[in-house]
Amino acid sequence: MKTTIGRLALLLAGFSFAHAQSAAQVKEELAIALRILAHEGVVDAYGHATVRNPSNPSHYFMSRNLPPALATAADIVEYDLDSQPFSANAPPGFTERYIHGEIYKARPDVMAVVHFHAPDVIPFGVTNVPLRPIFHMAGFLGGGVPIFEIRDTGAPTDMLIRNPQLGAALARTLGNNSVALLRGHGAVAVAKAPPAAANAISGAVPNPLHVVVGEAYYTMINARLQMQAIQLGGGKVNYLSDDEARMAGAQDGFERSWTLWKSEVSR
């Protein structure tokens, strides 16, 4: 009972970001996030993003099954943590919504999730070269990114996270990290609950949707730069130290990036 209460308290604490946001506003922000991810090349026709419902952290919002660039607030559907639609009349959803529901179950501190197939990240999931932070905008990658091996779950699959069991296995691989790779598939990025105090850089409490979009984008950019550095340096790369990654990870919630990206998809 104490564990359940503690988890719920953590969930509710994570929603300081949403005090001024209604569910309708969060849906609109999610639609904008999807269009940004598409505009910046993080997703194409495939990929998805979600955010917890600020009024009910045991539910999350996700678009119906359509290309991210086409999403509007009217396309956003509410799901419970079993990834079942709240409304009996909900339109068809994504097959891989279990990625999101199972991560939210396992990680009460996670407020938003992005799953993406950016080509830049794929090589790091199929080789013995770990994805590590190479520049200051990717400090959130920490000491390296874990890789989800779907073969370890048992029966052969088509690589997709089609059920809660596969989603839970992915969540275990993610652990307490911000990013995990899926071998031969893509990656997942998560935004943790913002701190109660305002960010020391921006003076504002970070918005998890802005954070997770920034993490997905800069994971893609870091992978691209790391590949170039490996080729240029013959495999010898000067990565961020653990301290540098930790300190660089305390960015301003990518608010400046979000402001630019939002203006670009709003024109």
Spell out what each predicted region is.
Residues 2-11:
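Sec-dependent signal peptide recognition
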Residues 11-19:
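Hydrophobic h-region of N-terminal signal peptides that target proteins for export
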Residues 20-267:
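Glycine-rich flexible loops
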